[in-house]
Amino acid sequence: MFFKKKQKHYEPFDLERPLLSFAKNDAWTIRDACEGTQIFGATGSGKTSGSGQAIAKSFLNGGFGGLILTAKKDERATWEKYCYEAGCLDALFIISPKSGYKFNFLDYELNRAGDGAGHTENLVSLFFTILEIAEQKSGGSSDPYWERATKQLLRNTIDLLSIAQGRISMMDMYKVITTAPLDYEDVQDTEWAKHSFCYQLIKQAKQKNLSHSKKMDLDFTIRFWLNEFPNLSDRTRSIIVSSFTSMADCFLRGVLRDMFCTETNIFPEFTHEGGIILIDLPIKEYGQLGLFAQVLFKYIWQQAAERREVYKNPRPVFLWVDESQNFITSYDQQFQTTARSSRACTVYLTQNLPNYTAALAGGSEARAKVDAFLGNLQTKIFHANGDHRTNTWASDLIAKTWQYRSNLSSSMSNDGKVFFPETTGKQSGVSHSEALNYQVLPHEFTQLRKGGYKNNLLVD
């Protein structure tokens, strides 16, 4: 008598619930998704339309919420199609200049739920994430001194505004920094004091009834603006000031001002309830503006995902980043170390390893950062690729095994009998050896199918 094996029932967001099946007994589960995914493949290899599409649709069909960053103009249409086919088009929120969705990131960070809301260091980290990506793209210095000095500038700007007026805006930060004293003559000049927004805030803050802790913060802030800042060399001051103002300038005009510095009617937390947020500011169209906006929203979304109480709402959320070399920051590695416990499913797609190294300004330090980040993405998918470093790295990941080899040898000899070749002798033998070799050789990745009609639309 034969009994049919009872199919296991899974709760919708059970970590062991299969999302995809690669073979009869090889399921890719929600748990696997939460451990992060990296997809490599050359242009035209099928990484987006092949494994990328399969994973994306499994997330949508599974009821996941998510954030999608865009590098190319056609990505919005692609995801609209995916959502329509999955029956969740109504859950798709598109942030674009014409959509009407706005996100005042400073107001959000000051007023969001949680004990960390409004803390100066959190706001400094938020700004520094944008500054980091700007420095990466410009090939700027990564000298720790400039990082510390810029953070000090931001910290004292935020504290002064927070204590004096109880609110912070990008424009007010800009005004504080650009009206600060440049030397001790300014500090003693009554005419400068009369017209300096920075000095007027200092006067206003002194009149506040503050706690002992806030008084100490204000004292340090005043010392910075009236003693330390004007004592900086012109070169040092100009570098740290321009680090902020060159970035802030983008948020003080046009698209970024209207979308990210006015009001808030969309929140990262929408994704925790199954919403899908797509930022339609592709960098191929909007350039640096699109990059700054998306990196900013990604950072805030990552932190919101880490703060949520998964035991109350176990719905997985995903972060989808195609052409991911454009959007990678140092915080990604830190986020990925705890993403599984937050049920955050990161999917990054790029052509090759050198893309990441170049994005992080190259060098051994950049390689170490890339290795640390990729080490925390447990699922790695390799499509057709012509990059030697990526293919060799893939072969190393798959590892080597001990393989047996047999060698057949033969030889012929006539022992010097020139006149009687028919007496020639023949010898043969077989030898065996064991060697440690790649299971998949690097060159095999160059031969994978890329789809198209000549491959019957199949992608390896």
What do these predicted regions represent?
Residues 2-14, 18-24, 28-344, 444-458:
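P-loop NTPase motor domains
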Residues 141, 145-149, 159, 269, ...:
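P-loop NTPase motor core of the ASCE superfamily
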Residues 71, 349-352:
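Conserved H-loop
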Residues 282, 351-353, 385:
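Histidine- and/or cysteine-centered catalytic micro-motif in compact active-site loops
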Residues 74-76, 99-101, 353-357, 389-390:
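Short gly/pro/ser/thr-enriched loop/turn and capping motifs at secondary-structure boundaries
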